[in-house]
Amino acid sequence: MKGDDLFSEALKLFPSGVNSPVRFYRPVPVMFERGRGSRIYDVNGKEYIDYSLGFGPMILGHADPDVASAIKRQADNGILFGSITENEVRLGNIIKNHVKSIEKMRFTNSGTEATMHAIRLARGYTKRKYILKMEGGFHGAHDYALIKSGSGTMTFGVPSSNGVPEEITKTVLVGKYNDENSIESLFNEYGNDIAAVITEPILGNIGVINPEPGFLEFLREITNKYNSLLIFDEVITGFRFAFSGYQDIINIKPDITTMGKIIGGGAPIGLFGSSSEIMDLISPSGNVYESGTFSGNPLSMAAGIAAMEKLQGMDYSRINNYTADLVKSLYDIFNDKNIDVNINHYGSMFQIFFNKNEVKTYDDAIKSDKDRFFKFFKKMLDHNVYLPPSQFETNFVSFAHGRDDLNKTIEAAKEAVSCI
């Protein structure tokens, strides 16, 4: 098989044969070469319905013609100039006009960069030491984020990462998502030196875990009380459920917002944004340093504008309803076979936890049956449905998914469940 041979070559070039850990699974990861709409195709020509969507960015589906044309036009006009461009202004205005908490922003090349700079900015603004993150919350692969993190660090049983200095871990406090007492106790002890709380408003790298009623409001209240900043990491949730941030849906205004994924139309991108007062601390107007050769690069800006202009006219209820219908059908299938699952979802995000109990916290999530999940993943793969290959990632639905995809996914799930 061509894919097996290529992966053998990849193993000689890249650690575990991949360039990001969660892409690896045994015996051999599928090697893809193209996509169109809701479908992706491997190097052997096999077609799959895709619910990974590049881990979230491809909300319009693969090879969207408007996004592809925008990238091609920009490539013909130049790939990198090392200076400000009109398209940076255009994309920045789209985001500013639809995310109320953002007055100014900086584009970066990834969500990792965005959260890294947001944390530095919060410390620079408050002149405080500690960052408080949530257990299982994932904010990228920089040192300050890799402490009791989610995503691949959970998939492979690594609590954080070797190579992160103890001096850094001592500046990061870890609270429990959906546990107000946990957060309050940390503020009682360290509150006057907590620069910021950073959280995904919906945890999306530990599967999907929704906030309990009042929890995010509590975070806003306690950070205000202690003059700490609240950072919402909306790299996943930004423009996923509506043409806005999730913060605008729930009407909670963070002090700093990070975004990525969808706003780049599938091209590499991230951003962090805040009030003018806070953002003006960024160099060269202030003394909090941030830079990047490829930040705001023309290809990503062109892709982002095309994607966002198209998204602005889309009816989000379509993908939200598709997801709700799929989740209901999956519950029926699992219940019919007396298999205990909890399927957490919001909007067009969902994840299946092989767990008889509700999953509301990190502790709940890690009790899920990872082996059974992987068996289900493999059987779905055998039936031409590609899910993210980890119990602790998230499935996504795109505007390219339609009734035929839904029906085929349900039939595949019926076959898969009978084998696990």
Curated annotation (Swiss-Prot):
Keyword field: Cytoplasm, Isomerase, Porphyrin biosynthesis, Pyridoxal phosphate
Cofactor names: pyridoxal 5'-phosphate
A molecular-function term among this protein's GO annotations: pyridoxal phosphate binding
One cellular-component annotation, GO: cytoplasm
Keyword hit for Isomerase: yes
Pathway assignment: Porphyrin-containing compound metabolism; protoporphyrin-IX biosynthesis; 5-aminolevulinate from L-glutamyl-tRNA(Glu): step 2/2
Family of the protein in this entry: Belongs to the class-III pyridoxal-phosphate-dependent aminotransferase family. HemL subfamily.
Stored InterPro entries: 4pyrrol_synth_GluAld_NH2Trfase (IPR004639), Aminotrans_3 (IPR005814), Aminotrans_3_PPA_site (IPR049704), PyrdxlP-dep_Trfase (IPR015424), PyrdxlP-dep_Trfase_major (IPR015421), PyrdxlP-dep_Trfase_small (IPR015422)
Pfam families hit by this protein: Aminotran_3
Official protein name in the record: Glutamate-1-semialdehyde 2,1-aminomutase
Phylogenetic classification of the source organism: Archaea, Methanobacteriati, Thermoplasmatota, Thermoplasmata, Thermoplasmatales
Catalytic activity: (S)-4-amino-5-oxopentanoate = 5-aminolevulinate
Enzyme Commission designation: 5.4.3.8
Organism of this sequence: Picrophilus torridus (strain ATCC 700027 / DSM 9790 / JCM 10055 / NBRC 100828 / KAW 2/3)
Modification N6-(pyridoxal phosphate)lysine, positions: 261
Enzyme class, spelled out: isomerase
Record's subcellular location: Cytoplasm
Entry annotated with the keyword Isomerase: yes
Matches recorded under NCBIfam families: hemL, PRK00062.1
Predominant place of localization: cytoplasm
Example of a GO biological process term: protoporphyrinogen IX biosynthetic process
Gene giving rise to this polypeptide: hemL
